[in-house]
Swiss-Prot record:
Residues binding ATP: D176, E177, V178, G179, L180, G181, K182, T183
GO molecular function: ATP binding; DNA binding; helicase activity; hydrolase activity, acting on acid anhydrides
Gene that produces this protein: rapA
Keywords, alphabetical: Activator, ATP-binding, DNA-binding, Helicase, Hydrolase, Nucleotide-binding, Transcription, Transcription regulation
Coiled coil spans: none
SMART domains to which the protein is assigned, alphabetical: DEXDc, HELICc
CDD domains: DEXDc_RapA, SF2_C_SNF
Domain Helicase C-terminal: 488-642
UniProt protein name: RNA polymerase-associated protein RapA
Keyword ATP-binding listed: yes
Leader sequence residues: none
Originating organism: Actinobacillus succinogenes (strain ATCC 55618 / DSM 22257 / CCUG 43843 / 130Z)
Occurrences of domain Helicase ATP-binding (ranges): 163-337
Length: 966
């Protein structure tokens, strides 16, 4: 291929991008801009999937200004084409440069292939038609971006994701309590933004300890391949890049990095700020602290990022726990114009408290007090509420229920932070199991006592070493086997033998401890174990998780390091052994959270074997008796940990001082109850109602559940694999193994590894076995598989015999599939209104369309394959007839496409105008509606209608059918 600036090419893999212009060429790469879609692509010159567009004499072409002309001659100047053309509107003859060609372009390739004997099989034609039909359905589906997640269908998560994910530029604070799925909500919002074309470049900033958890969650749950950035990665990039001033953040689209790294490395911080991202996610946002006098460095960095990144998701489980000022400051990061003054914010929040109390009364179906009616009237001052209040006093229960809901909905719309803050609590969501704790105090072995004494003589604090005595002992003698005398090991063996039918998760502090425990359990009792730690690759961890999940022949116990288990959930197990205790309440909750998730159906039993009168026992007692963190979630745990840290450290270093410790535990418990009461009193019922989604969220979950059970997905996918040439083997338990073969129609099938992959269509099985690929309409393997078919040449032409004794032999039918589409920027999301839409015609020799009378599947059952040489001869014989039928089909399609495009314009205008009117109405009563959001939506409405007016149609595929008698 010879490239030159100004040449026009199309993408073979993304023909919806329209006609591209080469803007830059060098020895290694070619850059091409696609104006119709406002997209730029860079390809390797040696393997660019591009086709040169050159027209011939007699072809009709279109100028960018819209007028058409017929090519009479072609010339070449500096490798670019010059066309001598005659305009159809005024007959003028001019020279047209190829760079001036219209960016939207149609190719009538199917008939060209047909007349050059490039005739495909009939079953491939059927596959292509079904792929087009399913592609259209998926673009219009309200479940797109929600159903493909590997997770249970939790209504409040789906509600938040749908509500936020469909916004133009979402800027929200996700503040659900621990275990309610903030990461999942953020992932679903992100996925919808990616599907809509609004987020190509994403930066996730998290604490260092959560980097791998996010990496695994994004990959396993959403099939999003993020890159982990640290100093080593940045330096490696600098070493391999030829440019001196290179920015590593420009090298990937989906990036995860730690906040600590950006803070400690000014150069990386500057580089991150110089990069254009579309969406920012910040986890553990409560670490961002602010006051009118000063802000911490973490806050200042995130503030700089939020000023230049249009979409922002902040995640925290403790929105107001660390003070109203910091809570206000986090909201200020999302909308500085709305949250401009702290005192005004406090006054406004105080104003909403009586309203929240009134909502609670409405929910309880109790009569409203005069004060509550006044509070509602103050907020809904533009409405005449007297008829509604009278209706609440009537005896008509149905009318009362309707009025109550109307009032609640109106109050939610006007809530001060309902557009930017979402918070669900366990008390509001319900459905969680109990957590039952048991502490096992064991004697400290003399071997550990001696080791501690040796350490003490070396000047170290011996009590610190007693947190992990096995590590201390092993470091002193690498050949020693601490598991031969450690009573925790004997207790664990007995425990596992007594619960052979149960799956048990054991979490250790370090990977080495987990590995050595596996050796001990296998050698002493032959207990089947899987080991899971950070030194393993993701594939190795998948295998370990699968071995543990296997209910028939799998491991009884999974031995995991604390870091290794991040991002993994083992809800099929209900027994957790903490062989080592984590250092703080947040890490403890993360460990318990491996089992305590929404969807866990059994009570969780937590076991802590520890040494009596040791720092381990002190910490266990403080967690349990002070925080009650084993048996309840403790949202104020870290605040108490920081407040009580100095006293706790004293007792950890003096574990035998029991009298003072009992008083310390009592004071901690009192403080916990006090903070818990404050949090409960501060609960915003109005906010929780808006965050929960109510019945609408339940209906959304049910709709996905119904689609999960639809056999159409399974039938289409297996047919796709079969025709492409992917080998399929039943693997049992609702799963199949698919493997590439040397006879596939394509060199590579998207997402299919050389060694094959095991897939399932069952959500519950996918949750239990993370090594399986969970196939849905949203899965990249299926989306890319459909693209593979519809963007390539598979099934573009076909010829078949119609066995029907009622028709005269030799009756000619022409089945045509046209596609009406809009080649427009992805961010407009016009596929909501006009996705690539297949229109089927079935013409007889007179040009009559029989498609309505003869359905596709009905016709398919009567067709027989035709040998390729016979098909080629037949097409040559009837070519004049086919050309005449094609001309008649074009006339029919012109009117149908016009109607379809007009309907799409009306729908777009209605939907976008309705949303504009809603936002404008709300803005009058809710300051939280941003003006830039309204202005942006109006621009989208105008641009959408303009782009839809340019929509075009093309012949995608055709099938020649000749009748024959049985």
């Amino acid at each position: 291929m010879v490239f030159a600036v100004g040449q026009r090419w199309i993408s073979e893999s993304e023909n919806n991008l329209g006609l591209g212009i080469i803007t830059e060429v060098n020895s290694r790469a070619v850059t091409i801009f696609f104006p119709a879609a406002d997209e730029t692509r860079i390809y390797a010159t040696a393997s660019a999937p591009l086709t040169r567009v050159v027209f011939n004499a007699g072809d009709m072409i279109t100028h960018q200004q819209g007028w058409q002309a017929q090519v009479t001659d072609i010339m070449v100047n500096n490798l670019t084409a010059l066309y001598l053309v005659r305009r159809t509107d005024n007959g003028e003859e001019i020279v047209l440069k190829e760079i001036d060609l219209a960016h939207q372009i149609n190719f009538s390739q199917p008939q060209d292939r047909l007349f050059t004997a490039q005739i495909d099989r009939s079953d491939r034609f059927a596959l292509r038609y079904h792929a087009l039909r399913h592609q259209q359905a998926q673009f219009k589906s309200p479940l797109r971006g929600l159903r493909g997640i590997r997770a249970g269908l939790i209504p409040h998560q789906l509600h938040i994701a749908k509500e936020v994910g469909q916004r133009l530029h979402p800027r929200v604070l996700l503040a659900d309590e621990v275990g309610l799925g903030k990461t999942i909500e953020a992932g679903m919002i992100l996925q919808q933004q990616i599907f809509a074309g609004r987020a190509d470049r994403v930066l996730i900033v998290v604490p260092e300890s959560l980097q791998h958890q996010w990496l695994v969650e994004m990959l396993r749950r959403f099939n999003l391949h993020f890159s982990l950035f640290d100093e080593e990665r940045a330096e490696d990039f600098a070493a391999t890049d030829e440019q001196e001033e290179c920015n590593p953040f420009d090298s990937e689209n989906l990036i995860i990095c730690s906040l600590d790294w950006l803070i400690s490395r000014p150069k990386r911080r500057t580089q991150a700020l110089q990069t254009q991202f579309d969406l920012l996610i910040v986890d553990e946002a409560h670490h961002l602290t602010w006051s009118p006098e000063a802000a911490n460095p973490e806050y200042q960095l995130v503030e700089s990022l939020t000023k230049q990144i249009p979409s922002v998701l902040l995640l925290t489980a403790t929105p107001e726990q660390l003070g109203q000022e910091s809570h206000f400051a986090r909201l200020k990061l999302l909308d500085a114009d709305r949250f401009y003054d702290y005192d005004a914010f406090v006054a406004e929040q105080r104003h909403y408290r009586p309203v929240a109390d009134a909502v609670q009364t409405l929910l309880a179906e109790n009569p409203l007090s005069a004060a509550e009616k006044n509070a509602i009237s103050d907020l809904l001052e533009e409405q005449d509420l007297e008829p509604l209040f009278k209706a609440l006093d009537s005896r008509n229960e149905e009318e009362k229920a309707t009025v109550r809901q109307e009032l609640i909905d109106s109050l939610i719309d006007r809530h001060g932070t309902s557009r930017v803050l979402f918070r669900n609590t366990r008390q509001g969501v319900k459905g969680f199991p109990r957590r039952i704790y048991r502490q096992i105090n064991l004697p400290l072995p003399k071997q550990y006592i001696n080791a501690v004494r040796v350490v003490g003589r070396l000047g170290k604090n011996p009590e610190d070493e007693l947190f992990y005595p096995e590590r201390l002992f092993q470091n002193m003698d690498q050949n020693a086997k601490w598991w031969d005398f450690d009573p925790r090991v004997e207790w664990l063996i007995t425990f596992l033998k007594n619960h052979r039918a149960e799956k048990v998760l054991v979490i250790c502090r370090q990977a080495q401890t987990a590995v050595q425990l596996e050796q001990a359990l296998r050698a002493k009792e032959g207990i089947r174990c899987a080991v899971f730690h950070e030194r393993l690759s993701i594939i190795e961890r998948d295998r370990a998780a699968a071995y543990f999940a296997d209910q028939e022949n799998g491991a009884q116990v999974l031995l995991s390091s604390a870091i290794g288990s991040e991002g993994r959930n083992f809800q099929f197990a209900c027994r957790l052994v903490l062989f080592n205790l984590p250092e703080n309440p947040d890490l403890l909750e993360q460990c318990i959270g491996r089992l305590d998730r929404i969807g866990q159906r059994r009570d969780i039993r937590i076991y802590v074997p520890c040494f009596a009168d040791s720092p381990q026992a002190v910490l266990a007692d403080w967690f349990h008796q002070g925080l009650n963190a084993f048996e309840e979630i403790c949202p104020m745990g870290m605040a108490l940990f920081e407040k009580c840290g100095q006293n706790l450290q004293y007792f950890l270093q003096n574990p035998t001082e029991s009298a003072g410790f009992e008083m310390f535990l009592k004071k901690t418990a009192e403080l916990r109850l006090q903070l818990k009461a404050e949090l409960e009193n501060g609960r915003d019922r109005l906010l929780e109602l808006n965050s929960n989604g109510g019945e609408a969220a339940q209906r959304l979950a049910e709709a996905i559940r119904v689609e999960d059970n639809d056999t159409e997905l399974v039938n289409f996918t297996l047919n796709l694999f079969d025709i492409i040439g992917v080998e399929q083997e039943d693997s049992g338990e609702k799963s199949i193994v698919i493997t590439p073969t040397g006879t596939m129609l394509v060199p590579d099938f998207p997402g299919l590894k050389e060694e094959g992959v095991t897939v399932t269509f069952d959500r519950e099985l996918a949750l239990a076995r993370e090594e399986l690929e969970f196939l849905t309409w949203d899965h990249p393997m299926l989306r890319n598989g459909i693209d593979l078919v519809v963007s390539g040449d598979i099934g573009k032409t076909a010829a078949s015999l119609l066995v029907n004794n009622k028709l005269p032999t030799g009756t000619l039918l022409l089945e045509l599939i046209y596609v009406v589409e809009s080649q427009s920027p992805k961010g407009l999301q016009l596929n909501r209104f006009l996705p690539p839409t297949p229109i089927r015609l079935l013409l007889d020799g007179k040009g009559q369309d029989l498609a309505a009378q003869v359905g596709f599947n009905r016709l398919e059952k009567q067709l027989k394959p035709m040998a390729k040489n016979m098909a080629s001869k037949m097409v040559k014989m009837v070519r004049p007839n086919i050309e005449k039928m094609l001309s008649m089909a074009e006339q029919l399609m012109r009117e149908r496409a016009k109607t379809l495009i007009g309907d799409a314009q009306q729908q777009a205008d209605f939907v976008l105008s309705h949303e504009l009117n809603r936002l404008n109405g709300l803005k009058r009563v809710n300051k939280n509606i941003r003006q830039d959001e309204i202005d942006g939506l109006e621009k989208i409405r105008i641009r959408s209608l303009s782009e839809l007016a340019k929509a075009s149609w093309r012949l995608d595929c055709l099938r020649v059918i000749v009748s024959n008698r049985a």
